Regions:
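Signature of extracytoplasmic/envelope-associated structural regions
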Residues: 1-398
Length: 398
């Protein structure tokens, strides 16, 4: 059999809400989202021993705490219905803390002490194509602590984008292996069996056996792996009995996604919280929530819970071509440190609009850009402030 490759063009990302911090979750096709790019980065303390050994070489390293980071960039995609969350709903919810849905829209509102977490999975889903194979990596105990929305000339080829960044407890992977030799009939009620190559799996791996044995439809979740004996443990009931040689592959279900891109040519920026429009070139709005993970206590090899480490930061920047009648509106108010009720609409159609609201926004001091050729420009940046608490930023899909 050929040693198949993994096709990077066929990536799907899935997000699932964890019931217990750091305990990986199974998934369904409705947990999927389309992405532009993403990265899952594992980390573990591995350093050389500091004691002297009588040699000029380092002889050993020690292992410490594990962690992971992630970044997911995707198009800003309203679902197409004002009462339905977008595909990346769990990422928005985890970053902001609160979700409100009514007959006019889906709204993400900041919260103080939300501490729930996610399992994120990046899958290469090939469908058994010739010369290629499925693969999956995951992070568990993940939280989103930074969101960056880009639109206009700051977006992707004129399309609005959103980037989610965060930290996680641990990283893992799901490769391809098979049921080990010596099995004639593994019962559907079994919770362990040996695999031929245990290093293809890790804690939190999600697999199916052959094409139909999916543990009830959401994949079979690996609880533990013994890399010496090859025994894996799981909790799901098998859909059918197993025997040696049956192939184990990552469980990457068909994605169910929705939404249409929002282009830079549609939308408005208002500095007074209404529909009064001021022309701009594009902008970027960033939320840094400053939640982190507790990964310091004795007795743990990775993070054990979510903690708030500091106050959040909401910032934004927008580019303008400087016009005669707008000097006072931009430079005059900036110089006086006037607060603004800033509203950014990306899109303008029902069911296809994202509204970003910062009701107390103050500009920073910024230099003008006056080139030898072309028109004078200014990039205005500033900070969103809270008024009554947890209201420095709101995002609505209308």
């Amino acid at each position: 059999m050929a040693n198949e490759l993994f096709a990077g063009s066929q990536v799907i990302v899935y997000a699932s809400r964890e019931a217990t911090y750091g305990t990986a979750r199974r998934l369904n096709g409705t947990d999927a989202m389309l992405t532009i790019s993403e990265s899952f980065t594992p980390a573990e303390e591995r350093d050389v021993r500091p004691d002297r050994s009588g040699f000029t070489d380092h002889l050993d390293r020690y292992r410490g705490r594990k962690s992971a980071t992630f970044e997911i960039t995707r198009l800003l995609l309203p679902s197409g219905s004002v009462t339905t969350e977008p595909d990346d709903d769990l990422l928005w919810q985890n970053a902001f803390g609160r979700l409100s849905i009514n007959s006019t829209g889906v709204e993400y509102i900041l919260a103080t002490a939300h501490d729930w977490s996610l399992t994120l999975r990046r899958a290469i889903r090939t469908g058994g194509g010739q010369g290629v194979a499925d693969f999956q990596e995951h992070v568990r105990g993940a939280i989103v602590n930074q969101v960056e929305i880009s639109e206009g000339n700051q977006g992707q080829n004129g399309l609005a984008t959103v980037t989610f960044r965060g930290v996680a407890k641990d990283w893992g992977w799901t490769g391809n292996t098979s049921v080990a030799s010596g099995y004639l009939n593994i019962a559907t009620s079994a919770t362990t069996f040996r695999v031929s190559s245990p290093r293809q799996l890790s804690v939190g791996s999600l697999f199916k056996v052959f094409n139909t044995n999916t543990g009830g439809g959401s994949g079979i979740l690996v609880n533990t792996v013994n890399y010496t004996t090859g025994v894996i443990a799981y909790s799901q009931s098998l859909s059918a009995t197993l025997s040696s040689g049956r192939v184990l592959v990552p469980y990457n279900p068909t994605a169910t996604t929705a939404g249409q891109p929002l282009h830079a040519r549609i939308g408005l920026l208002s500095l007074d919280g209404s529909a009064t429009k001021i022309d701009h070139l594009g902008g970027r709005v960033t939320l840094e929530d400053n939640r982190g993970l507790l990964n310091e206590e004795v007795g743990y090899d990775s993070a054990s819970r979510v903690i708030r480490e500091n106050r959040r930061n909401v910032t934004a920047s927008f580019g303008f071509i400087l016009k005669k009648d707008e000097v006072g509106e931009l430079l005059g108010r900036r110089d006086r440190n006037d607060s603004r009720n800033l509203q950014l609409n990306i899109g303008d159609a029902a069911n296809k609009t994202c509204k970003i609201h910062m009701k107390d926004f103050e500009w920073d001091m910024t230099a003008l850009e006056i080139p030898d050729q072309g028109m004078a420009r200014v990039t205005m940046s500033g900070r969103g402030l809270g008024v009554n608490g947890n209201d420095s930023l709101k995002v609505r899909f209308l």
